[in-house]
């Protein structure tokens, strides 16, 4: 609210413009329903985790889904404590963890989100 209405909007209008595209929902189910209503079809649900699961997919796989435009995607970033197993099992896919040069791969959500969004929607520098 601060960035959309008060001093924050005046201080940083670019952030206010970006947040105009954000919609808040009270649950994952309501987010899926909102996307379904807007897009006319249910989204492919994808989440992130520092662990792998049987339905873990690569960045390349999700990037192809995103660029195909066949179905809407709902990408959910969890918390530092992760999500309940039942919730994890409800997603179509779990995106592979962000791996680095060592075994430790737990990042704050803001850092992980920035890296993941760049890998999914950023320039494909590795194809050049």
Predicted regions and their residues:
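Structured adenosyl-cofactor binding patch, chiefly the S-adenosyl-L-methionine
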Residues: 81-128
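Short, catalytically relevant binding-site loops at active-site mouths
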Residues: 1, 52-54, 102
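Long, charge-patterned amphipathic alpha-helical coiled-coil/hairpin "stalk" segments used as oligomerization
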Residues: 49-86
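Residue-level signal for well-ordered alpha-helical segments
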Residues: 5-12, 71, 89, 93, ...
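Flexible, charged surface loops at secondary-structure boundaries
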Residues: 36-42, 66-71, 89
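Structural motif
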Residues: 43-46, 72-75, 92-94
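RNA substrate-binding interface of SAM-dependent RNA methyltransferases
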Residues: 1-50, 114-126
